[in-house]
Amino acid sequence: MSNLYTIDAKLFEPAAIDAETAAFNERIEKELSVAPPLYRFEPQVIRDARAAGYSVFGPVKHLDQARSRFVPGPGGDIPVRVFIPPKVAGVYMHIHGGGFMLGGADQQDEFLAEICKACQVVVVSAGYRLAPENPYPAAPDDCEAVALWLAKNSRREFGTERLVIGGESAGANLSVATLLRMRKRHGFRGFRAAVLTYGGYDMSMTPSVRRWGERYLILNTKIIEWFHENYVQGANVFDPDISPLYADLSGMPPALFSIGTLDPLMDDSLFMHARWLAAGNRSELAVYPGGIHVFNFFPIKLAQKANTRINDFIIGAVSDNL
């Protein structure tokens, strides 16, 4: 594990990958080798299949403890999934992944329920309009609306103003975009930390994405290009609202960047961690040998390690000592 400022080169060596992770990766790659790549399907076909449990993620489980609500947004009501612990230490605004095209606020109940329980935080998972039907800026517009709702209402709704924001993959991108919008448009700096897990922060594509090629480990270069094209649809990929790697990152909250070494988006986290620090912010980088994209959603020890680190970071962010 790296500390705040240095990266151990040994983490990137094949020998650093434990046997369980290697076997898991081999199984996933074998399963996907006989599956057509995502870009051969219409997005709604993929969404329906995933909702029915036909994916490497298995069945979608909805928990009784979760509550579905709606927050007013620029394109209509925005669905949010809410988990409330017995004692509230803070609020975690979660933004789901899915390449800006897939996923939903209600598709990771077990994952979010564990964060709620372990960290004693209310979890508010934001749904947002999906591309290509709703390209940029629909997704960040919706996430901004949920963040603004929390900024105005979290004390009345949940008894606290201790806010943390975060997400995975596209959700990490949208988390940073939301922080930047809240600072620029509303003068709001109330998020105490950002949990940024294997995000993609450069729609022009970092070297690790460009060089990855066809190897199909959840993502590959062409799938990422497909996601980007459907989301951006002709907008400027260097716009910091789309590619926050190019943003003025001054005044951002402490962040935890988590990335696996077998994720095409690895450089995005390495670069963003460096830029976060260079802007004068606190940043931690957690590098996981052999971790593939979305590895922390699967029942392996590497996932437990990553999720424990994330939970500890959230606990620290909402503590009285911050």
Annotated model-derived regions:
Residues 156-169:
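Alpha/beta-hydrolase fold nucleophile elbow
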